[in-house]
């Protein structure tokens, strides 16, 4: 009887150890940072929304981060992978207005109203008002992007 209990305890201990190692491995693997190789790949880390939803967030006085850019912009192409890395490191939601979309005129007008002079533009909104933005645009470092995302 004692031998059977010892075998059961050993088996349970082994199962627990293997389970713990599997959980740790999966958690570590999940935290691997992927550096996107293209603008399109980088944009899989943002949530693309239409201008009407951005205006709704402003009207509802929400806190959010907004990226305005376009694939045809070489500066946006340089910035997008850094943004994707920062998003992965902070796990923040970043909304994306695509200035190459059908809403281009409306987005350009909105950007002008928000005092956005160039793309890429990453801005934080607090209670529906633009509070801060990256002044260096595509020249911003990953750490500077992270700082804006975590304010």
Set out the residue ranges of the language-model regions:
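Solvent-exposed loop/turn segments at secondary-structure junctions
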Residues: 71-74, 100-103, 129-130
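Extracytoplasmic/secreted envelope proteins and their assembly/folding machinery
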Residues: 55, 80, 84-87, 107-111, ...
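Non-catalytic, surface beta->alpha helical segment in thiol-disulfide oxidoreductase systems
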Residues: 123-151
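Short Fe-S-cluster ligation motifs
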Residues: 102-120
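Extracytoplasmic/secreted cell-surface and envelope-processing proteins
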Residues: 75-77, 106-107, 131-134
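N-terminal targeting signals for export/organelle localization
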Residues: 1-44, 151
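Thiol-based oxidoreductase modules, predominantly thioredoxin-like and allied folds used
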Residues: 45-48, 68, 92-107
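Local sequence-structure signature of Cys/Sec-based thiol-disulfide redox active-site neighborhoods
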Residues: 55-92
């Amino acid at each position: 009887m004692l031998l059977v209990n010892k075998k059961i305890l050993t088996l349970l201990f082994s199962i627990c150890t293997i389970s713990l190692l599997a959980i740790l491995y999966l958690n570590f693997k999940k935290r691997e940072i992927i550096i996107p190789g293209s603008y399109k790949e980088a944009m899989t880390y943002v949530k693309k929304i239409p201008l009407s939803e951005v205006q709704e967030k402003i009207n509802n006085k929400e806190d959010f981060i907004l990226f305005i850019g376009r694939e045809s912009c070489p500066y946006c192409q340089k910035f997008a992978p850094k943004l994707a890395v920062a998003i992965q490191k902070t796990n923040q939601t970043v909304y994306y207005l695509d200035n190459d979309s059908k809403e281009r005129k409306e987005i350009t007008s909105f950007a002008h109203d928000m005092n956005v002079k160039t793309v890429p533009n990453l801005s934080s909104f607090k209670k529906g008002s633009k509070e801060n933005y990256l002044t260096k645009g595509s020249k911003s470092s990953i750490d500077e992007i992270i700082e804006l995302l975590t304010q």
